[in-house]
Amino acid sequence: MNVLFLSYNICILFFVVCTLNFSTKCFSNGLLKNQNILNKSFDSITGRLLNETELEKNKDDNSKSETLLKEEKDEKDDVPTTSNDNLKNAHNNNEISSSTDPTNIINVNDKDNENSVDKKKDKKEKKHKKDKKEKKEKKDKKEKKDKKEKKHKKEKKHKKDKKKKENSEVMSLYKTGQHKPKNATEHGEENLDEEMVSEINNNAQGGLLLSSPYQYREQGGCGIISSVHETSNDTKDNDKENISEDKKEDHQQEEMLKTLDKKERKQKEKEMKEQEKIEKKKKKQEEKEKKKQEKERKKQEKKERKQKEKEMKKQKKIEKERKKKEEKEKKKKKHDKENEETMQQPDQTSEETNNEIMVPLPSPLTDVTTPEEHKEGEHKEEEHKEGEHKEGEHKEEEHKEEEHKKEEHKSKEHKSKGKKDKGKKDKGKHKKAKKEKVKKHVVKNVIEDEDKDGVEIINLEDKEACEEQHITVESRPLSQPQCKLIDEPEQLTLMDKSKVEEKNLSIQEQLIGTIGRVNVVPRRDNHKKKMAKIEEAELQKQKHVDKEEDKKEESKEVQEESKEVQEDEEEVEEDEEEEEEEEEEEEEEEEEEEEEEEEEEEEEEDEDEEDEDDAEEDEDDAEEDEDDAEEDDDEEDDDEEDDDEDEDEDEEDEEEEEEEEEESEKKIKRNLRKNAKI
């Protein structure tokens, strides 16, 4: 591993050095090429400009000379008819023509004045035509120049694109490690460094040309036109040499890359195939191990689930049984309590009936009495309340004593009940006496007692007191003799007026009051009968409710049992399905194993058959040898020559046997390969 790591690091360092050298070399070559291209373009442009300017100057001079000569001729012919201005112009033109071409002057004094006008017209037409031709020629020249420049630009672009593609291909090969530089020897790095230094020193002038315009001008740039012609030839020669060298280098690089690419590709393909095979084997082994682990994990999970489910079911059953027991106990307790209450209710009802007394009515509003009488009434009410409070406490104490006696012994209960009944009768008499006292106080309000059904006139305050003590009051209209109005100052005080106004009642309603039917104490027999009927109805209702609850509970229990049975059946079915799936998987695995065993047996049988064939052949050969030996024994004395022939035959037979054995081994190997592929 250490050796591989070191070799890998060395390759990376070598690749980095090669890329740096190549980049510097490409940069220097690019500078030189750009310099040569600039020189070429400058020379071509300057040469074209010089040639065009010289030609145009020559043409302009010739055209001017011709026009001047013709004008002079025309002026000489038309001297008498022209004006002084024409004479001056002719004189100036003669001076110019004499200064340019004095040899081309022609005397025109021999021509006639009649033909002068026609000639002028012809000359004007010719001038016009010439001007048109010159304009067309100039346009054509410009178009040709533009076309040439466009072609030149396209060629430059095409060359640049080619170089970029080549450089990109080379760099891609460097990145993949498929390309090696030319001078990649033991001392390759030193040689490359020396070459780069020499190229940079030789091309220092080129860098100066690109960097500063003044130096380029001093070396024969665009300062003087004559120096351009001198340097143009040298630059062209250098360009040709550089192009030829570049072509050779490119061709060599392409050949080297092709050879290296083929070898490296083959090696990499082999390595990749080997790695793929190794990875496939590893993946197969990992997959097999994962499958085994998953199967084991699933089996363990199933076992754990089953155990947990069984435990949960047991716990649920235990909890249900506990709940049922608790509910039954609660029901029993409830029934016991209800029975005790029913036994105690008739005693309490009898006590309540005896305790039901007319409500202590306060002083009426319509009572026109002295304040002393009013105080006496209030004092009586207070005494009545205190008496009731004492009686209530006395009842509670007696009730506690009765419960205590019941717990001690049942026989004593009957005696205690008799005593209580006697005490209740005495109390009833005492209460009736108090009622009569209260009625006397109430009778003061009565105007005329015509209603004999126990109807009494009650004030609003009396009505409120009755409602506070839960005594029902029925309102009825008063009879006509009772509706006797009394004057307001005689009946009402200031306090009464304020109460009437607060309750939003009319004075007449307050004066008359309201009639209320107070519940008169019923007879004891009727009350007992009513209470007995009520208790029986309540008991029947409770029984009915209990029956319904029992039915509901039974139905719930039946449903729960049915659900449990269904769940058990579903679980059994699921277990059976899981077992079937496991059996199917095991059967499939067994079938696969059997198929593999059958294939192996077939291979073994083929091998055995081949071995048997070989053994039979050997036996046949042995029998033949024995026969030959017997014949030899019989004929030893007769023919010794036959012995030599038999020996030769034996050798041939042995050779044939060896060949057959080799063929049989080859067949066995082939069959094994085929089976392995299958």
Swiss-Prot record:
Compositional bias (Basic and acidic residues): 56-79, 109-120, 231-329, 371-411, 532-565
Ranges for region Disordered: 56-194, 225-445, 520-678
Sequence repeat spans: 120-122, 123-125, 126-128, 129-131, 132-134, 135-137, 138-140, 141-143, 144-146, 147-149, 150-152, 153-155, 156-158, 159-161, 162-164, 372-376, 377-381, 382-386, 387-391, 392-396, 397-401, 402-406, 407-411, 412-416, 417-421, 422-426, 427-431, 432-436, 437-441
Regions of compositional bias (Acidic residues) in chain numbering: 566-663
Compositionally biased region (Polar residues): 80-107
Keyword Phosphoprotein: no
Biased composition range(s): Basic residues: 121-165, 412-443, 667-678
Record field: transmembrane: none
Annotated spans, 5 X 5 AA tandem repeats of K-[GAV]-K-[KH]-[DKEH]: 417-441
Record carries keyword Repeat: yes
Keywords tagged on the record: Malaria, Repeat, Signal
Chain segments carrying region 9 X 5 AA tandem repeats of [EGK]-E-H-K-[EKS]: 372-416
Protein name listed in UniProt: Glutamic acid-rich protein
Coiled-coil region(s): none
Region (15 X 3 AA tandem repeats of K-K-[DEHK]): 120-164
Signal peptide extent: 1-25
